[in-house]
Amino acid sequence: MAIYLTELDSTFNFPSPYEALSDPNGLLAFGGDLDPHRILSGYYQGIFPWYGPGEPILWWSPSPRAVFDPLTFKPSKSLKKFQRKHQYKVTINQATEHVIQLCSSTRPADETWLNEEMQAAYIQLSNLGHCHSVEVWHDNTLVGGLYGISVGQLFCGESMFSLKDNASKIALWYLCTHLASKHGQLIDCQVMNPHLASLGAFELDRDEFIQKLLSLREKQTASDTFTPQVLQDSES
């Protein structure tokens, strides 16, 4: 069966997310490039790049959409107990490039979409103030973290990694707590999976997600939300 997709041109325009295919879920367009301004334009419309080895750049806007509500996120009792015992240090925006690299290198080469071109694009977005990371440290070594794109009061999570037990879960927990205190309203996780569901993610259909996106992208978090800072000191 033939699939007809829009090919992106030199402008940063995208087709409507409502034109995305249902199978494969959310596939919307192909081509273009990974210019940071194009990527950011996509996020502001609920569209993100994802493609595998040997494929053109593919752009997606799936439905339903997996999300977290920072205001209602609750870490499990076992996770809180783990953190009390191990006291991982948690920071924000102190090692974004390293986090992006580890999100790629900690996965088998044939299982990651985060190739060198994608890494470079998100590092550029970090330099422009749009891509942010949460880092988890143990004995001054980076052992877990996540990164994503800020779109007003929406945070679009991209990837996470964990080199020690629960490190990525702790990154998510502290991100939620931090965003909740800084007027952050929603975390987009793109597509649901069992791991996200176990942490409390829930789904929004396309209409509801786009409505929230259109509202939240026009609002701002506190001015110091993504200032490099310590969220949890290892000795606190």
From Swiss-Prot:
The entry's keywords: Acyltransferase, Cytoplasm, Transferase
Signal peptide limits: none
A Pfam family it matches: Leu_Phe_trans
The protein's Enzyme Commission number: 2.3.2.6
An example Gene Ontology biological process: protein catabolic process
Xref: InterPro entries: Acyl_CoA_acyltransferase (IPR016181), Leu/Phe-tRNA_Trfase (IPR004616), Leu/Phe-tRNA_Trfase_C (IPR042203), Leu/Phe-tRNA_Trfase_N (IPR042221)
Reaction it catalyzes: N-terminal L-lysyl-[protein] + L-leucyl-tRNA(Leu) = N-terminal L-leucyl-L-lysyl-[protein] + tRNA(Leu) + H(+); N-terminal L-arginyl-[protein] + L-leucyl-tRNA(Leu) = N-terminal L-leucyl-L-arginyl-[protein] + tRNA(Leu) + H(+); L-phenylalanyl-tRNA(Phe) + an N-terminal L-alpha-aminoacyl-[protein] = an N-terminal L-phenylalanyl-L-alpha-aminoacyl-[protein] + tRNA(Phe)
Single Gene Ontology MF annotation: leucyl-tRNA--protein transferase activity
Xref: Gene3D superfamilies: Leucyl/phenylalanyl-tRNA-protein transferase, C-terminal domain (3.40.630.70), Leucyl/phenylalanyl-tRNA-protein transferase, N-terminal domain (3.30.70.3550)
Gene Ontology, cellular component aspect: cytoplasm
Keyword Secreted attached: no
Annotated localization: Cytoplasm
Family, as annotated: Belongs to the L/F-transferase family.
Function description: Functions in the N-end rule pathway of protein degradation where it conjugates Leu, Phe and, less efficiently, Met from aminoacyl-tRNAs to the N-termini of proteins containing an N-terminal arginine or lysine.
This protein's name: Leucyl/phenylalanyl-tRNA--protein transferase
Species name: Vibrio parahaemolyticus serotype O3:K6 (strain RIMD 2210633)
Lineage of source species: Bacteria, Pseudomonadati, Pseudomonadota, Gammaproteobacteria, Vibrionales
Gene: aat
